[in-house]
């Protein structure tokens, strides 16, 4: 089971959207993936993200590579994961 794969639900750990959940829609290369919230569910808009800024979860939805936000939203509703996606995660930064 690869951690970074299309359909994997992840938590963003860096940036302005830190603590928000997103879905991997496409794998661009070894370092970057395309993610979406979708924006109306989690507030994460569709964008390219470094994989070091993501923490994969154990949850995955069955979507095609490059799926639209509407397709992702429909699959989340079918899987009863909409409320799970809306939950924010508190990110704690290590202190020195």
Swiss-Prot record:
User: Any idea which GO molecular function terms this record carries?
Assistant: RNA binding; structural constituent of ribosome
Is the keyword Ribosomal protein assigned to this protein? Answer: yes
UniProt GO BP: ribosomal large subunit biogenesis; translation
Gene Ontology CC annotations of this record: cytosolic large ribosomal subunit
Q: Which UniProt keywords apply?
A: Ribonucleoprotein, Ribosomal protein
Tell me which SUPFAM superfamilies the record gives.
Translation proteins SH3-like domain
Domain of life from the UniProt record:
Archaea
Alphabetized PANTHER family for the sequence: 60S RIBOSOMAL PROTEIN L14, LARGE RIBOSOMAL SUBUNIT PROTEIN EL14
Q: Which NCBIfam families does the record match to this protein? A: PRK04333.1
Recorded family membership = Belongs to the eukaryotic ribosomal protein eL14 family.
Spell out the protein name for this chain. Large ribosomal subunit protein eL14
Q: Please give the organism.
A: Saccharolobus solfataricus (strain ATCC 35092 / DSM 1617 / JCM 11322 / P2) (Sulfolobus solfataricus)
């Amino acid at each position: 089971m690869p951690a970074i794969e299309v359909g994997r639900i992840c938590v963003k750990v860096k940036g302005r959207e830190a603590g928000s959940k997103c879905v991997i829609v496409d794998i661009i290369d070894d370092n970057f993936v395309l993610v979406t919230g979708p924006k109306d569910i989690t507030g994460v808009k569709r964008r390219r993200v470094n994989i070091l800024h993501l923490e994969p979860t154990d949850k995955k939805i069955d979507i095609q590579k490059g799926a639209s936000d509407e397709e992702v939203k429909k699959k989340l509703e079918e899987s009863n994961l909409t409320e799970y996606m809306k939950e924010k995660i508190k990110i704690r930064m290590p202190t020195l």
